[in-house]
């Protein structure tokens, strides 16, 4: 084992190693999240976490990283870009017959990749310390990763509650490495949102109820990924063709003009998930679903909820007799799916009877214009 390094030198080496491992930025902070505890408790008290009971169950543990790994003194916070080339944001959103999947989920599940890189970083640090305990986290334990990233200088919290970076926007994953050595800490950066409320006004379902506060129960990401039961009827028409997650609050953000493309091949879109036809997706058997989503974040919602989400999107599409036939073909498979199919069929018939050729969603039309003008590379 080599001689222990000066902590300032070690911190610089850690940041360099992080870049070599594929992270775009590395910051260091202490474990004090006491300022976040009242906000977290107020959010939970308002039931904004919906059916994510584990969030309430873990309570304030999320704001106390030192309790996850006793002896923890510092948190090394990292970010990794995930935006793929040819993201096709606007072209997918404005085509109702296509299914929109949040761009972070088009490739391989990020959890394992980031965790392995963080583990390697911990092992590299270990080689330069007499002793070191470390533990990597990637959205996998009760930890407030965004406040930690903010304290570590990776960016500031936007009004949509995501971390924003002046040079990279918000299309990146976060990860943490807890360590028990007193490394020098980084300073937070100045926030850059000012009076802008674009993310709040563009949200299809009005889920950003006040600056920095998201009511998950209205968020399309929650509805399509976390919610296990029926999607509230009043929110279904607002979901459009989004079948797994939603990127609207990021796409409207001016800072994402500076978003950087990923350098990771694992985050490249899988062909069956990139601008897919809704009718084709709705025809997938469970076997096909499991095969296509192997190693993907999408797999965890299961085939039933996948079909539930697509049924809603088909219900939101313009009248098409092939859609009606597709919906009819899956009746009787499960009560949850049947309920959403019945709703979708009713929507289709209503449009047929009213001769509605196109469903107008002003927010979506505005978003598409903004993307095509401000993010031409990714439109």
Question: Residue locations for each model-derived region?
Answer:
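Alpha-helix N-cap/helix-start positions at coil->helix boundaries
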Residues: 260, 300-305, 334-339
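Short, charged low-complexity linear segments at domain edges
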Residues: 163-188, 216-235, 286-290
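Flavin-dependent oxidoreductase catalytic cores
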Residues: 188-198, 208-211, 299
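Structural detector for internal amphipathic alpha-helices that build alpha-solenoid repeat scaffolds
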Residues: 307-318, 339-348
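Alpha-helical adaptor scaffolds
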Residues: 270-304, 311
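Amphipathic alpha-helical scaffolding segments comprising HEAT/armadillo-like alpha-solenoid repeats
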Residues: 289-292, 319-331, 351-361
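Iron-sulfur cluster-binding cysteine motifs and their immediate structural context
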Residues: 23, 198-222, 228, 242-266
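Auxiliary alpha/beta "docking" domains used to position bulky ligands
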Residues: 1-192, 240, 357-379
């Amino acid at each position: 084992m080599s001689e222990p390094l000066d902590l300032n030198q070690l911190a610089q080496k850690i940041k360099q190693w992080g870049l070599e491992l594929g992270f775009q930025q590395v910051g260091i902070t202490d474990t004090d999240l006491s300022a976040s505890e009242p906000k977290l408790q107020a959010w939970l008290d308002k039931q904004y976490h919906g059916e994510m009971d584990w969030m309430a169950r873990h309570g304030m543990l999320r704001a106390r990283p030192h309790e996850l790994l006793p002896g923890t003194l510092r948190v090394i916070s990292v970010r990794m870009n995930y935006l793929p080339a040819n993201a096709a944001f606007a072209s997918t959103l404005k085509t109702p017959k296509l299914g929109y999947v949040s761009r972070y989920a088009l490739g391989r599940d990020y959890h394992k990749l980031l965790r392995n890189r963080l583990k390697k970083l911990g092992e590299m640090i270990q080689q330069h310390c007499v002793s070191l305990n470390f533990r990597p986290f990637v959205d996998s334990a009760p930890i407030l990763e965004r406040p930690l990233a903010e304290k570590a200088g990776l960016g500031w919290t936007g009004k949509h509650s995501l971390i924003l970076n002046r040079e990279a926007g918000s299309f990146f994953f976060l990860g943490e490495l807890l360590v028990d050595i007193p490394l020098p800490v980084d300073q937070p950066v100045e926030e850059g949102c000012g009076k802008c409320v674009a993310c709040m006004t563009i949200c299809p379902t009005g889920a950003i109820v006040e600056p920095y506060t998201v009511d998950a129960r209205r968020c399309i990401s929650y509805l399509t990924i976390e919610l296990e039961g029926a999607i509230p009827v009043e929110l279904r028409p607002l979901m459009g063709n989004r079948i797994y997650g939603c990127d609207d609050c990021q796409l409207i953000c001016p800072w994402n003009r500076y978003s950087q493309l990923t350098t990771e091949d694992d985050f490249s879109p899988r062909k069956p998930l990139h601008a897919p036809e809704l009718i084709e997706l709705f025809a997938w058997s469970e076997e096909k679903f499991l095969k296509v989503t192997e190693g993907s974040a999408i797999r965890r919602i299961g085939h039933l909820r996948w079909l539930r989400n697509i049924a809603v999107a088909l219900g939101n599409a313009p009248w098409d007799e092939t859609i009606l036939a597709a919906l009819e073909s899956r009746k009787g498979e499960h009560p949850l799916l049947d309920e959403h199919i019945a709703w979708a069929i009713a929507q289709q018939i209503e449009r047929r009877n009213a001769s509605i050729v196109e469903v107008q969603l002003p927010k979506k039309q505005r978003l598409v214009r903004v993307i095509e003008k401000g993010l031409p590379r990714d439109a």
